[in-house]
Amino acid sequence: MAAGSVGVFATDEKIGSLLDQSITRHFLSTVTDQQGKICAEYVWIGGSMHDVRSKSRTLSTIPTKPEDLPHWNYDGSSTGQAPGHDSEVYLIPRSIFKDPFRGGDNILVMCDCYEPPKVNPDGTLAAPKPIPTNTRFACAEVMEKAKKEEPWFGIEQEYTLLNAITKWPLGWPKGGYPAPQGPYYCSAGAGVAIGRDVAEVHYRLCLAAGVNISGVNAEVLPSQWEYQVGPCEGITMGDHMWMSRYIMYRVCEMFNVEVSFDPKPIPGDWNGSGGHTNYSTKATRTAPDGWKVIQEHCAKLEARHAVHIAAYGEGNERRLTGKHETSSMSDFSWGVANRGCSIRVGRMVPVEKSGYYEDRRPASNLDAYVVTRLIVETTILL
């Protein structure tokens, strides 16, 4: 199935891209002198909590840390994050990445969002107040409290590529289904490894940007892929995961395909998409007591199972059915090397008496700030 055409005005799959990207590539490759200035692409989470927004500004100096960057604002009424009569939302830079699209000294900036600054009676500025969709703020507070425990994370981000016109998985027969699952996971070859170009370009661009991406593989559902981000410590997990998604959206824009983070994109006897979250602390990584600490963590996670499930991704009930390598949504379980459990512990952890474990409950549309905050709260702070 062709993936070449996209756009609100396109109705025929054979229509080419509305914009000729070869022209864009020509000029971007030949025009390299920016007269000592750089482009900074400010990136933030939009009002749906799934979309990622961005806009650019020109800087005269190259920042070395987020604090060197100016705060900015945007029209929150156009992103579902503010009313029209008081529409300004403020952006505070938090993490800097290289811009793999523009190259050179240009940068991508992960930001979080705040209400406009308020002035105290004494004329000083009050501390910025996060808007409701700013989940990074609470996560940063929790990670600061737990930093002595050195929480490490690695998230497995599954996604499905869709034809931008039909909204059907890339490479699937129009209005039909491919052969059953089996030949697609970690596959190679035409007809089974569908969408590798997208996965490979995304992989390389994340590396170039400085996103701590650690691997890529084709998944069980045809046109479904996974990439892994981590290990990342504390708040950096959320920053790197959200920037990796921004880069994915940009790559799919270039290929005129859509990416879906829906946890069950195709109903029926097909695998869903997860955001399995691997986790360890200094205590779990230290033998011989690490294995005991992991078991204590599992007991704590069981006690707050309902709290975690409620925040682990919209539509997750369609995925967590106890089938297709998932646990039951209503029941907590953990086990060694068991992919049908809520928590999977690696085979060597009981042997080595230390290590990490995998929370398999989060959906592919997870908010990494929310999931990592909850895990640390439950296992360390409560």
UniProtKB/Swiss-Prot annotation:
It is an enzyme of class 6 (ligase). Residues 135-382 form the GS catalytic domain. One of its GO terms (cellular component) is cytoplasm. Its EC number is 6.3.1.2. Residues 36-118 form the GS beta-grasp domain. InterPro entries: Gln_synt_N, Gln_synt_N_sf, Gln_synth/guanido_kin_cat_dom, Gln_synth_cat_dom, Gln_synth_gly_rich_site, Gln_synth_N_conserv_site, Glutamine_Synthetase. Homooctamer. Irreversibly inhibited by the herbicide L-phosphinothricin (PPT). Belongs to the glutamine synthetase family. This is Glutamine synthetase cytosolic isozyme. It comes from Chlamydomonas reinhardtii (Chlamydomonas smithii). The lineage of its organism: Eukaryota, Viridiplantae, Chlorophyta, core chlorophytes, Chlorophyceae.
